[in-house]
Amino acid sequence: RIELTEEGQLFLGYAREALNQLAQGEEALKLLHCAPSGKLRVDAASPFVFHQLAPHLKAFNQAYPDIKLEITSHDNIIDLLEHKTDIAIRIGELADSNLHARTLGVSKLQLVASPDYLKTAPPLNELTDLASHQLIGFTDAPHLNHWPLTTPLDLKFSISASSGETVRQLCIQGHGITLLSEFMINEDLKAGRLVKVLEGEVLSPNRREKVHAVYYQNSGVSSRVLAFLDF
């Protein structure tokens, strides 16, 4: 990755602002005569796309037929301008002060396992019992392996994956216990593919629960972005 000099960083800031001003001017002209239209690029982690966005996209397309959606999936935080992204859905704490954010909601974390795993697993009555169990973690997001438990533990993971959706599938297939957001596993819990374990042992609220939509900070917001956020 190319690193900019101090002069380059300064120029980049002005260039970004100039592009934003041009985009705002174009948007203002569009708003005078027509409904929201054009390309809207939305980025979110794969599990959020599968379980939260996808079920609503058909209705959004019917409501705004002139908006062309482009959905991308990154499980790690991306630079919106670098990836030409209009909106990113982020779960957990926000750090980028150059972004506007709208809170979409809260998705609590749950410790879960498959019934098949629990049939042959050691007893699981308290948090310290986790030491004798297989745990499923994340490879590319170490902070997700620090579970916000009522009693802090040094957890050892038997298997890890880079994608939250892969972690979910590993859990369903009986590879161990994991900690996932409710939006990912609600249907699995209803269907009996997963069950909650050690209920009440996850701290709430915690820094990983909030779900935000973020977009680049400027003096105007495109009608496409507002249409998506308000839908």
Question: Regions from the language model: what does each represent?
Answer:
Residues 37-100:
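Central regulatory/effector-binding core of bacterial HTH transcription factors
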Residues 199-231:
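A late-sequence structural motif
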Residues 39-43, 88, 136, 178, ...:
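Short, well-ordered beta-strand segments
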Residues 94-212:
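C-terminal regulatory
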Residues 3-31:
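Alpha-helical "hinge/linker" immediately C-terminal to small N-terminal DNA-binding modules
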